[in-house]
């Protein structure tokens, strides 16, 4: 009985996840689908042909989005590891304040944050640049990385590194050979979360990038706002495909890194 309930819940969750994806695929080739009709009244290849007909622009948007999100994910992982080790293993003045600052971006609405940081970035010359967008995304994504890596760092502790030091390892060797392989699943999960947060940012990218830095979100959202569901669906499917591909790459890296042939780093 318990197994049947679990299977029913899993089936329901799969339906909730897959049904919107199926509707996106249908809307890619739909020109008119008015309520209350159950099926589209008119099919068309207009949206798909228009998007894929601009391959040059599409590739630029693709590389820009992946570059920004990958940079944010990598920086979030590196800074997250260093921050968590400092907060967990060391005592210093202002430790509690630093811990509070790591979650502060959670408390500030994105609109308020974007408006405030835009003025600062204009003075620093970082507006309308990819580096400025990466830095802004990093501030929003870093708390996710810190929170995820913090739990893993606390659970692991420093005892194994201390034993490696006793056996003659340097501080870097003790971390790289002992702690890092164990923390790899947590670090990659944090990087994945940071990637998703960055990849889906619209308002912050618009404010800091000033329309000069184009990502999938910047291109897709105007079609959603204008009601052109066919065009929005094409970009949404591409958005989903790119994200799943990157997550597949992270899964492969996780398997290689941890040398675990039985499961990936999400398990």
Give the residues covered by each predicted segment:
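Loop-to-helix entry region at the N-terminal start of transmembrane alpha-helices
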Residues: 57-64, 119-142, 184-191, 235
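Transmembrane-helix boundary motif in ABC transporter permease subunits
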Residues: 1-4, 68-102, 115, 119, ...
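Interhelical loop and adjacent transmembrane-helix boundary motif
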Residues: 2, 45-57, 198-256, 267
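Membrane-interfacial helix termini and adjacent extracytoplasmic/periplasmic loops
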Residues: 36-39, 95-96, 111-141, 172, ...
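Faces of alpha-helical transmembrane segments in polytopic inner-membrane proteins
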Residues: 16-17, 72, 76-79, 101-112, ...
């Amino acid at each position: 009985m318990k197994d049947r309930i679990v299977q029913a819940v899993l089936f329901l969750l799969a339906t909730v996840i897959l049904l919107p994806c199926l509707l996106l695929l249908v809307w890619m080739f739909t020109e008119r689908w008015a309520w209350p009709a159950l099926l589209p009244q008119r099919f068309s290849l207009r949206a798909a042909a228009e998007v894929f007909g601009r391959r040059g622009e599409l590739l630029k948007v693709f590389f820009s989005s992946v570059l920004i999100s990958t940079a944010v994910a990598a920086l979030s992982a590196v800074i997250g590891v260093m921050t968590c080790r400092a907060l967990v293993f060391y005592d210093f003045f202002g430790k509690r304040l630093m811990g509070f600052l790591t979650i502060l971006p959670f408390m500030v609405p994105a609109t308020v944050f974007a408006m405030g940081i835009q003025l600062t970035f204009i003075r620093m010359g970082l507006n309308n640049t990819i580096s400025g967008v990466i830095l802004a995304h990093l501030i929003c994504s870093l708390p996710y990385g810190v929170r995820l890596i913090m739990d893993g760092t606390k659970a692991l502790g420093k005892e194994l590194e201390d034993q490696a030091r006793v056996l003659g390892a340097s501080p870097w060797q003790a971390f790289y050979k002992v702690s890092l392989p164990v923390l790899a699943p947590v670090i990659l999960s944090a990087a994945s979360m940071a990637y998703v947060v960055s990849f889906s940012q619209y308002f912050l990218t618009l404010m800091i990038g000033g329309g000069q830095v184009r990502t999938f979100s910047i291109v897709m959202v105007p079609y959603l706002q204008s009601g052109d569901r066919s065009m929005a669906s094409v970009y949404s499917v591409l958005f989903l495909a790119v994200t799943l591909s990157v997550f597949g790459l992270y899964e492969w890296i996780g398997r290689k890194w941890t040398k675990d042939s039985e499961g990936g780093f999400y398990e």
